Structures are given as structure tokens and as C-alpha cells.
Amino acid sequence: MHRRALFLSGLAGPALVQGFAFMPEDQLLALLRLGGLNLYLRHAITDRSQVDTGRRGDRAGQRNLSEAGREQATRLGRAIRALNIPLAEVLTSEVFRAKDTAELAFGPERVRVQAELIADDYTSGSAGEDAHATSRLLARPVSGGNRVLVGHIVPLGMILGRGLAQQEFPEGAAGIFRPRGADWEFLGFFRAEQLIRAAGI
């Protein structure tokens, strides 16, 4: 059944996601090295003393990466390169914590802002419509490597059909999707520390 239809209708989304049989880490790594997957990467660790205002383009009015988050993003990029995981493109939310994560991990020259990846409290339209558009993007096949989408926890929960706990999808984690054109298959989560450990850095 089409995953996006479940999100839009609100039918059986939680049961579907809970029924996923996540792949073991070594199998996921092998698939990532082959390319053709979509990685929904949550921004790196943030400074929780800062409060979001919902104002776009206002760094001082947003929750930004902490020093630990900047280091995490840099190490995550190094880990992906060390693991020989090929990348075709890197798309990001315009919110600074996501854009900074993308640029620190993959280099500013590779990063392109994608409007629908915006955080739910910064959207100028409907968070549901943005999540729907992102779900379509996750279903879109990619050649020449993997596609990285740097975004936020709430939109991914909307796409999967249930709220995600911080422990389940912490800052710096990635959800791995196999695109099928008309829909997608969710393969599981990778935490940042898993990739960093696997790379031995």
C-alpha cells in the first residue's frame, strides 16, 4: 500500500510503521554503498537553550547547532566518505540548524535548499502539504549515488504516520528509504554514532 496515502488519510499509519522489519546495520551499509537510496537526515545536535521564533532568515531567532552539533555534523560527513557511501545530491531545509548540518557534513558547494524540507513551525503554508511533497521526493529514484535530505523530526513523523520520540530519531540520525517511483520502502534508522563507529573515526 502507498505510504503517502496512509499519511494523508490517517489510516493505519502507526501499525504500518511498527510492522517494519528494519534491516541489520551491515545490510543497510551494503545497500548505501551501492547507492540509489534516499537518506532523511535530521539536523545535528542543537543548543536547547535557544528558542525558535518561526522567523526565516533570522539566525538569532532560531535554535542553532551547538558546538557538539557542529562537531557531530563534521564527523558524520567524514564517516560517510570513509565508508565509501556515494552521494548524488544533498538537499536541505533552509532553517539554519539543517543548512549548517548539510554544509558542515558535505560542503556548501554540494548543498541546495529544498523548500518542502522546512520545519513545521517555519512553513509559510501547510506542514501537511510540505510533508506530502517530501514523501514524493523520498519516492523519487536517484542515480549516481544516494540522495540526502536534511530536515526535521516532526515532518518525518508525519510522513511515517506517527510521532517519533527523540530517543528513536535523535539529532544527527537518518531514516533510510528505498525509492520505488510511485512509493517508497522504509528500511530503518541509522544514528550518527553508528555511522561514525562503523567508519572507525
Predicted regions and their residues:
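Residue-level signal for well-ordered, solvent-exposed loop/turn and beta-edge residues enriched
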Residues: 5, 70, 183-185
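Active-site-proximal alpha-helix that buttresses catalytic centers in soluble enzyme cores
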Residues: 22-115, 120-123, 128, 163-174, ...
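Internal catalytic-core helix/loop-beta-alpha segment
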Residues: 127-135
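Active-site-adjacent alpha-helix immediately C-terminal to a catalytic or transition-state-stabilizing loop
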Residues: 138-187
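Hydrophobic residues on the short alpha-helix immediately C-terminal to a glycine-rich phosphate/catalytic loop
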Residues: 10-11, 105, 159
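A broadly conserved amphipathic alpha-helix scaffold signal in soluble, globular proteins
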Residues: 103, 135-139
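N-terminal export signals
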Residues: 1-21
